[in-house]
Amino acid sequence: MNLTLNLIQLQTIEMRVHMDCVGCESRVKNALQKMRGVDAVEIDMVQQKVTVTGYADQKKVLKKVRKTGRRAELWQLPYNPDHMGGSSSNGGYFYNPQGCNGPINHAAPVPTSSYNYYKHGYDSNDYSSYRHHPVHASIFSHQTGSKFSDENPNACSIM
């Protein structure tokens, strides 16, 4: 009997999660910290970025964040420790000899997501030609004007 263990390596998962307030941030953070295999959760509200470090599966982490009601997708430029560190003019955040942010020789991969947002109408320009026409009905009926008419003997009189 051959037993093979599926060992998941320590990984860093970066996601873009749409969060509006501190309550959303705490909901996402609490949900992720309760997961088995998650060691650390860092949230950057300015960039709408959530960084999860641990042994948890990427799909399970995405699913857990989406269960909180927040929209989540993988970060476009995945974590790459080769581009971190070093001393440069930009504080060593992303180090490149040219002084630009992000990896230069690599094209940004298309974010992979287990949920097809395009299929469900998110992030699509298909609806740009749709114009919302306001409803022409109002809160007043067509007989409202006759209630205040001088010709109507049962009309209201405003003094």
From Swiss-Prot:
Presence of keyword Lipoprotein? yes
Please report the stretch or stretches of sequence annotated as the HMA domain. 10-73
**Which residues make up the pro-peptide?**
157-159
List residues with covalent lipid attachment of type S-farnesyl cysteine.
C156
- GO molecular function list: metal ion binding
Query: Which positions are annotated as binding a metal cation?
Result: C21, C24
Checking InterPro entries in the record gives:
HMA_dom (IPR006121), HMA_dom_sf (IPR036163)
Modification type Cysteine methyl ester: residues: C156
Give the highest taxon in the source lineage: Eukaryota
Entry keywords, A to Z: Lipoprotein, Metal-binding, Methylation, Prenylation
Show the Gene3D superfamilies listed in the entry: 3.30.70.100
Q: What is this protein for, i.e. what is its function?
A: Heavy-metal-binding protein.
- Indicate the family of this protein: Belongs to the HIPP family.
Provide the protein name: Heavy metal-associated isoprenylated plant protein 28
